[in-house]
């Protein structure tokens, strides 16, 4: 039997904190152990409460989420961190940086004005990610994808990399080790909103000897890209 997952909610918006806590309280596997309204409080409460998971807003007063994250990785290394980010170019850039600093995952803040839709979007993404981070038993997905289109006979040589939790940091470590003359095309699958994949590709391109770019529809595959 799984023990309850202890969660600390960090956001400067009282409305957002209440929204997140009310969503998480509906799941019997999750226990809200505390709330914080800025990075300074987050560091103090993380040391005191020792949560399993911390949901951390990026834009906050006194100490922003990125600065707080740097402290949390040193002072509360056993707590998993999920970043909350706005669906903007600035938010995407900050999120990719957070993932490179050691954040374990992220959830985009809903852009919809509908309260019900906001609740549904956060609930759909946040709860499974919290459970996955701590190894909580999740039900198997029963939905079967449509069959893939058959390829013409022949030899297709590519390197495929699929990543999930902790993906961006792992990708950077892998790509750093690959030579610039890598002999086959590389395909990376990472589930992210479009703005985030653009920022991720740009960051990986800076740290890799290979050319890394966001894929375009119909673009031919090239060796070493």
Tell what function each PLM region has.
Residues 1-225:
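Strand-loop microenvironment adjacent to phosphate/nucleotide-handling motifs in alpha/beta enzyme folds
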């Amino acid at each position: 039997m799984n023990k309850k997952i202890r969660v600390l909610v960090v956001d400067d918006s009282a409305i957002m904190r209440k929204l997140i806590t009310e969503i998480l309280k509906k799941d019997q596997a999750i226990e809200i152990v505390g709330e914080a309204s800025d990075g300074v409080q987050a560091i103090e409460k993380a040391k005191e409460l020792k949560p399993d998971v911390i949901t951390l807003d990026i834009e906050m007063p006194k100490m922003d989420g990125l600065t707080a994250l740097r402290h949390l990785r040193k002072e509360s290394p056993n707590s998993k961190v999920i970043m909350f980010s706005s669906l903007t170019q600035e938010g995407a850039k900050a999120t990719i940086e957070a993932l490179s600093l050691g954040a374990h995952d992220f959830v985009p803040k809903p852009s919809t004005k509908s309260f019900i839709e906001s609740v549904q979007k956060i609930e759909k993404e946040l709860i499974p990610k919290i459970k996955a981070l701590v190894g909580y038993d999740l039900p198997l997905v029963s939905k079967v994808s449509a069959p893939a289109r058959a390829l013409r006979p022949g030899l297709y040589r590519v390197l495929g990399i699929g990543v999930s939790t902790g993906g961006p940091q792992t990708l950077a470590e892998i790509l750093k080790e690959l030579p610039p003359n890598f002999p086959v095309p590389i395909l990376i699958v990472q589930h992210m909103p479009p703005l985030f994949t653009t920022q991720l590709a740009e960051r990986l391109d800076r740290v890799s000897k290979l050319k890394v770019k966001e894929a375009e529809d119909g673009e031919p595959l090239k060796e070493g890209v």
